[in-house]
Each structure stands twice: as C-alpha cells, then as structure tokens.
C-alpha cells in the first residue's frame, strides 16, 4: 500500500505546476483579447476618420463604452478563473487529507495488531505459570509419598528387628550387618532426598520469583500499552473530529464557490449575449447612419442642383408657372431633408438612451463585484 500511494503521488502533478499551466493559458487568452481589441480599435479609428466632429465624439463615446464593457467582461472572466483555481486547490487539499487519514488508519490498525499479539503472549505466559504451579504441587505430593514410604519402611524394619527369632540365631549377625547397610543406605537416601528437596525448593522459589517478576513486567507493559492505546484512540478521535469539521467546512466553501461560480458564469453569458446583441444593434445603426448620411448628401446635392437650376431657369424663363413648379420641388426637397434630420436626431436620442442604460448596468455589475 505505501508503494502504491507513492506511485500515485508521483503520477499526480503538484499544485504549483497546475497553477503555472493555468496562468500560461490565462496570459495567452489575455494576449488574444488584446490583439482583438487592437484590431477593433484600428477599425474604429479608420471609420472615425471620415466622420464629422460631432459624430466623432459620439463614436468615441460609444467606443469608450464598448472598451469599458470589454474590460469588465475580462475582469469577470479572470475572477471566474481564479474561483475555479481555488476550487481545484481545495480538491487537492481534500485528497491530501484523505491520504493522511488512510495512513493514520493503517498505523492504528498496526498498533491494534501489535497489542493483540502482546495480549496473546501474556495469555501464553499465564498458562505457563499455571503449568509451573501444577508441577510444583505434583512435586510436593510425590515428596509426601516418599516420606510416608520411608516411615513405613522404618516401621517394618523396627517390627522385623524386634521379633525374637530363636530358630534363626545364626542369621542375627547377617541381619545386623544388613540392617547397618540398610541404615547407611537409608541415611544416604535421606541426605539425597533432603538435598533434592532443598534444590527443588530453591528452584521452585527461583521459578516463582522469576515468574512473579515476569508477571509484574508484563502487567506493567500491558498497562503502558493500554494507556498508549487509550491515548492513541483519543488522538484518533480528535483527528477524526477535526477532519470531519475541516471536510464539512471545505464542503460548504466548495458549495458556496460553486454557487458563486455558476452565478458569475451565468451573468458572464448574459453580458456576452447582451454585448453581442448591442454590437449587432450598433452595426445596424451604423449602417443606418451611413445610409442617412448618404441620403443627406444626396438631398443636399439635389437641393444645390435644384437651386442652381432654379436660378438658371428664373433668369432664363420669367414664367410664374415654372417658378411655382420649381418652388414646389424645392419645398419637397426641404421637407425630405427635414425628415432625414428628424430621423437622425431620433437615432441620436436612442443611442444616448442605450448608453445611459449601459452605464447603469456597468454600475450595478461593479456594485455586485467590487
């Protein structure tokens, strides 16, 4: 298991490398946006060169609004990317905490197995102690039996020597010598039994002392291991509670960040859609402005030609009917020119209304994302 965890850690890239790649992607995207903005500015400057001062001012105002909106969109995108990076870092931290928890669980399991082995060893020592006690009791009972047999033999010897065997007087000397030999042998046996009994008692006392010492040592070791196990259990419980709190806090933070990220992405999509729609509207309005300008130029040229023709025809022909017709044509051209001028003023008013709405929307967005 530790080798597999090491290989997994080696396979997963560090958070610094991930952040570096994301920063490179963000820089590339910012450069692309900067290039696109420069192209748009060049086109806008090319269009502004053929416009009047008033229209140049309006175009500059529109261009500043569009640039401000694009900057705001870039800010929102950068903040959403930062929120996404925070989420990824939190996920990495959660995975590291999970690995630490698994390692602590494995350590606790190994300690529990070690404690179980020590308890089994203690039980084996207890059974050996009981066997030694039974061996000591059996040795004591055997010693008692030997003492009883020795007393019986003494009694039999006394009964045999006390009897008067008149018909076996010839064997008295032999029995006397045999009795002496038996007595000597009995003394040797007594000394041997006493020596063996003292050795057995000393060995028994030594074994009892050693067993008591081992029992005390094992009891102390068991008590220490139990106290260590209790402290380890308390530490594991505290670590588990702390990890649970941290996981709960991380989960709440992840949920909050996900909600804010979804809101930012949705507002970003809405702003992009709105900017695209406004771009289309501006393009349409610019086309209408160009058409109106062309119509105005055509009307001005027609008015100029009509006035010239009117002057020429007024000089050439002094007829009231011709003068009325020319005057009617001049009035028609003037009316068309007035209508075109009214349409141009209405379009300017509509453009100013759109700009004011855009300023309000930008102010609301700045208030939402300070």
From Swiss-Prot:
Predominant subcellular localization, coarse grouping: cytoplasm
Segments of this protein annotated with the region Disordered: 1-21
CC terms in the record's Gene Ontology section: cytoplasm; nucleus
The organism's place on the tree of life at top rank: Eukaryota
InterPro entries xrefs: CCDC89-like
Residue positions where Phosphothreonine is found in the record: 12
Keywords: Coiled coil, Cytoplasm, Nucleus, Phosphoprotein
Subcellular localization, as worded in the UniProt entry: Cytoplasm; Nucleus
Tissue: Expression is restricted to the adult testis, where localization is almost exclusive to round spermatids.
Family: Belongs to the CCDC89 family.
Quaternary structure and partners: Interacts with HEY1.
Protein name: Coiled-coil domain-containing protein 89
Species lineage: Eukaryota, Metazoa, Chordata, Craniata, Vertebrata
């Amino acid at each position: 298991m530790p080798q597999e965890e090491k290989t997994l850690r080696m396979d997963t890239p560090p958070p610094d490398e991930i952040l570096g790649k994301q920063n490179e992607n963000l820089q590339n995207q910012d450069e692309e946006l900067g290039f696109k903005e420069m192209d748009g500015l060049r086109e806008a400057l090319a269009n502004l060169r053929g416009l009047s001062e008033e229209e140049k001012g309006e175009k500059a105002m529109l261009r500043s609004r569009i640039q401000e909106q694009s900057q705001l969109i870039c800010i929102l995108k950068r903040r959403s990317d930062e929120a996404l990076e925070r989420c990824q870092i939190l996920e990495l931290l959660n995975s590291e905490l999970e690995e630490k928890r698994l390692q602590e669980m494995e350590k606790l399991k190994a300690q529990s197995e070690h404690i179980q082995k020590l308890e089994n060893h203690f039980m084996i020592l207890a059974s050996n102690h009981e066997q030694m006690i039974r061996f000591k009791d059996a040795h004591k009972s055997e010693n008692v039996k030997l003492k009883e047999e020795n007393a019986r033999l003494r009694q039999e010897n006394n009964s045999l020597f006390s009897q008067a065997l008149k018909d076996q007087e010839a064997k008295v000397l032999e029995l006397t010598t045999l009795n002496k030999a038996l007595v000597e042998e009995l003394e040797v046996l007594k000394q041997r039994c006493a020596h063996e009994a003292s050795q057995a008692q000393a060995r028994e006392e030594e074994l009892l002392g050693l067993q008591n010492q081992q029992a005390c040592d094992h009891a102390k070791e068991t008590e220490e291991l139990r106290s260590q196990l209790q402290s380890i259990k308390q530490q594991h419980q505290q670590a588990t509670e702390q990890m649970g709190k941290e996981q709960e806090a991380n989960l709440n933070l992840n949920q909050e960040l996900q909600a804010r990220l979804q809101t930012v992405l949705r507002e970003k999509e809405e702003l992009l859609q709105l900017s695209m729609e406004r771009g289309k509207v501006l393009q349409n309005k610019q086309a209408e402005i160009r058409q109106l300008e062309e119509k105005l130029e055509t009307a001005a040229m027609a008015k100029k030609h009509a006035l010239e023709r009117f002057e020429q025809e007024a000089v050439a022909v002094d007829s009231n009917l011709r003068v009325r017709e020319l005057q009617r044509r001049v009035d028609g051209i003037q009316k068309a020119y007035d209508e075109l001028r009214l349409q141009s003023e209405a379009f300017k008013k509509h453009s100013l209304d759109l700009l004011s709405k855009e300023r309000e929307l930008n102010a609301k967005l700045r208030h939402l994302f300070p």
